[in-house]
Amino acid sequence: MSQSEFDSALPNGIGLAPYLRMKQEGMTENESRIVEWLLKPGNLSCAPAIKDVAEALAVSEAMIVKVSKLLGFSGFRNLRSALEDYFSQSEQVLPSELAFDEAPQDVVNKVFNITLRTIMEGQSIVNVDEIHRAARFFYQARQRDLYGAGGSNAICADVQHKFLRIGVRCQAYPDAHIMMMSASLLQEGDVVLVVTHSGRTSDVKAAVELAKKNGAKIICITHSYHSPIAKLADYIICSPAPETPLLGRNASARILQLTLLDAFFVSVAQLNIEQANINMQKTGAIVDFFSPGALK
């Protein structure tokens, strides 16, 4: 999906909030603050006029209109109406926010509900065709690199392990220097799968730029559709995640990224399911060999 296609693909219902969060990336601090206020449950319950919103946020009415248009709406009323529909349709799956003094049972229930909400919102805007196009190129590629930093690198290691089970070899690199060395050797017909929540990590961006320059295709899993790394990508798989107290945004992002990559993995496996099953039996037998009691 191109940047222009994303900008025009305004979703309805539960998919609206994650779409707006992704559009929020790259906005100024004041613009972003307006989006956060609008997305907070309860703030639009009394159908406030644009004047009321401007006063509540200490900004001009013109700024509210500007943000509405940046989000893809003709004006504030149109945006407010869409958000009212969103909150009406999603009230059953929107958990109340975590508090610092909650009872243990409430904490556990809310964490589960936040995860469920993240998965449902991600599913509502997922581009299935983009996943299948990316999966086909990944499967056919000569060399497959996996790039990510911090927690995203741990996800890349999981992806490498998952694909090795079905005989699709790919390599995750834990060090930025090794990542760059590998990128320098890539060529046309190769692919990089990059996992980056922000889409702005400098080390990862440098490796992706080099891989792109050398002719490799880029598949990007990211929350930020308009980020520098996403703009380098040939295939973008959106991973929107809400930010919550205590958990932040990374916890929700990790769960959704793993789910999207599971879908990506199955899409790749389906391209040659017979061979995938044969290879799973082989690799599974080796793992079983090292299980307790197997060496007796």
Curated annotation (Swiss-Prot):
Q: Which SUPFAM superfamilies match?
A: Homeodomain-like, SIS domain
For the keyword Repressor, the answer is yes
Domain SIS: residue ranges: 134-274
- Note the SS bond partners: none
Q: Which segments constitute the HTH rpiR-type domain?
A: 14-90
The residue range of the signal peptide is none
* InterPro entries hit by this protein: Homeodomain-like_sf, HTH_RpiR, RpiR-like, RpiR-like_SIS, SIS_dom, SIS_dom_sf, WH-like_DNA-bd_sf
Q: Which UniProt keywords apply?
A: DNA-binding, Repressor, Transcription, Transcription regulation
Specify the DNA-binding region ranges. 50-69
Q: Name one GO biological process term.
A: carbohydrate derivative metabolic process
Q: Record keywords: rRNA-binding included?
A: no
Listed Pfam families: HTH_6, SIS
Name the job this protein performs: Regulatory protein involved in rpiB gene repression. Also involved in als operon repression.
The identity of this protein, by name, is HTH-type transcriptional regulator RpiR
Q: Which organism is it from?
A: Escherichia coli (strain K12)
